[in-house]
Amino acid sequence: MSTRPAFATAMKTILLDVGGTFIKCSDGREIPIDSDGSREDIANSLKEALADAQKAAVAIPGPFDYEHGIFLMKHKFAAVYGECFAEIIGGNREYRFIHDVNAMLLGEMASGAGKAYERVALVTLGTGLGFSMSLEGHLLMNELGSPLVPVYTLPFGDGILEDYVSKRGFLRGYQGLTVKELAQRAGEGDRAALERFADRGTILASCIAPILKEYGIQCLLFGGQISRSYFLMAKTVEEGLRNVDSLQYAGPVQDIGNATFNGLKTLL
């Protein structure tokens, strides 16, 4: 974790959760952003989100150089690849940057479901598949500040794990349906929908169990929008992790909507 000094609290600060289509702001605003857009479009959205704040703590997906604030993504924000966040925006603000999955994990360790544990892992289920771990209060990160052990690229089936356990994985074979709607079908007893959630739980557990065992994880949390339907896959997840002797708890984060902001607050 960064040892840089915390922000001075006298200056106006904003917390930003930057996604591929929206920027969620700690003041309640949601600013549209097109991660496939032009440099100008991306800059304008970021400027609107920052408004008149003098300091900002920013959660953003990787690859990204979190120490220096440099975009390194090619699949998103390609128009600003290699550029510095602060230079794109201009002005004289101060920034702290953190991987979005790391931010959520920090939030849950500070004031959520992970608070009582020393070895915590987080899986985020949404458009993509995220994974982060913390041991004794320290995030496990690579040299750029991204989670040390990415699981989305783990080989599985005819592709990678993210192909199966993410939005596109849950909706394989379904046209014009959202994961929320699929969950509603499952809640109404639709057998195929129930099996889809159960299968995704089995797949995920089988792939991450060796990692959880290796690091002695005690608490496994689930975040992201799909985790709102965790109860539909809880049984198969727990069955698949029954041989992880260190594991004491598995379940959704305490505050899906605010966990990332809670993590960003710890940077201030």
Q: What are these language model-derived features?
A:
Residues 4-44, 70-72, 139-161:
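Short glycine-rich, Thr/Ser-proximal phosphate-binding strand/loop in the N-terminal lobe
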Residues 13-17, 55-57, 119-124, 130, ...:
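Short glycine-aspartate micro-motif
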Residues 18-19, 99-101, 125:
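Fold-independent oxyanion-binding glycine-rich loops
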Residues 21, 61-64, 126-130, 226-227:
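Short glycine-rich anion-binding loops that position phosphate/pyrophosphate groups of nucleotides
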Residues 26-27, 39, 96, 111-199, ...:
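Glycine/GP-enriched mid-protein hinge/lid loop-to-helix segment characteristic of carbohydrate kinases
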Residues 31-54, 171-232, 249-260:
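Adenine-nucleotide phosphate-binding core of ATP-dependent small-molecule kinases
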Residues 35, 39-44, 55-56, 62-119, ...:
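Glycine-rich phosphate-binding loop and adjoining helix at the ATP-binding site
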Residues 264-268:
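Short, hydrophobic alpha-helical segments
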